[in-house]
Each structure stands twice: as C-alpha cells, then as structure tokens.
C-alpha cells in the first residue's frame, strides 16, 4: 500500500504477495513487527481497511503466527475511534496512530486517551515535533505533552524520520552522509530534541 493509492484495496493482491514473501523470509525472527496499511487516506473507511487486514493478516500468520501486526487507521492513521468501534478479532494486533505535534494537538491526544482507556492497543508508528507536512515550525510544548501522554498510557512510539532530507522532520542535517559515528553536530533541532 502506498499513499497515492489512498485505499489499500486498490492493490491488495500486491500486498498479499509482499507479506507472503516477507513473512516467509522473516517468520522465524522474533524482532519483526509488521505494519500493514500505512496511512490510508481519502475516502478510505475502516470497513475497507478491516477487509484488507482480514485478507493480509492470515497470510502473515501462516508464516509468523505470533508476530505483532500493526494496522493503519483511517484519515492518515488518526481515526482510532473507527477501529475501536469494530476491532479485528486477532489477539496480537495493534492500531497505528500518526501525529505531528505542531499540527495535531488536544483533539488527537484525547482520541488516543479514549482509545487506550477503552482497551484498544495503539502503537504510534510515526510522529514528528513539527507540522504534518514534515516542514514548518517545531512545537516543543505540544511535543512534550505528547511524549508525556504516551509514556503515561504505556504506548510505544517511533519518531519520523531517520534521514538527512532537507526538512524539519529529518533527524540528521542535510549534509550528513555518515552511516555511523554520529555526533550532536550531525543532528537537526528535531534530532537534538
């Protein structure tokens, strides 16, 4: 699934082939988390995503029965309420939330709190401390509120993005070409945070 597809059902056959291959190759590894349906958008509904997940998850489970599988949620992985209202029956599934601290504030934090309080297992598989575009200003106050909340709720999170792209969300400065031996001078403001 790519963002330009908007709906994961568009190329579901390709996702099935991909996850069959990847889970076949990595099924014995105990450190692999599968994220299916990255940032569904446009008019994609939870029913669309759920149908996709119900087709793809058994393919992964055939090769990796105990793996954690994270499923994207509608509206760029932000509509946890839709997933909470009709969750998948699989016991080892989590639901993705993506946010950018300078864009997504109290409303989305409340949605996360509500979903977790209701028992929905959530993994923040992408966040940044800048605007949702990956550019713009950093909002340290909102970012700190987000991290405090995720820690209080025991929600795992991953910061986007580990690159040297010329944008606010990148953790490394554009001129950094290293693959190891990083110093603080190699980091952007988001990387230093």
Where do the language-model regions lie?
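Extracellular glycoside hydrolase catalytic/binding regions
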Residues: 11-33, 37-165, 169-193
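Aromatic-lined carbohydrate-binding surfaces of glycoside hydrolases
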Residues: 1-8
């Amino acid at each position: 699934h790519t963002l330009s597809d908007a709906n994961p059902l568009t190329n579901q056959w390709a996702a099935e082939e991909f996850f069959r291959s990847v889970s076949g190759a990595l099924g014995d590894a105990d450190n692999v988390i599968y994220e299916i349906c990255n940032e569904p958008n446009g008019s994609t509904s939870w029913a669309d995503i759920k149908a996709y997940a119900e087709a793809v998850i058994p393919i992964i489970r055939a090769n990796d029965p105990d793996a954690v599988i994270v499923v994207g949620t509608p509206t760029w992985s932000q509509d946890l309420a839709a997933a909470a209202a009709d969750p998948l029956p699989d016991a080892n599934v989590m639901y993705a939330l993506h946010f950018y601290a300078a864009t997504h504030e109290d409303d989305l934090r409340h949605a996360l709190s509500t979903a977790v309080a209701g028992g929905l297992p959530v993994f923040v598989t992408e966040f940044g401390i800048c605007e949702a575009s990956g550019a713009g200003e950093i909002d340290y106050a909102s970012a700190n509120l987000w991290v405090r909340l995720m820690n209080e709720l025991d929600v795992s999170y991953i910061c986007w993005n580990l690159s040297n792209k010329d944008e606010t969300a990148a953790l490394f400065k554009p001129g950094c070409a290293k693959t190891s031996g990083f110093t603080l001078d190699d980091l952007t403001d988001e990387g230093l945070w």
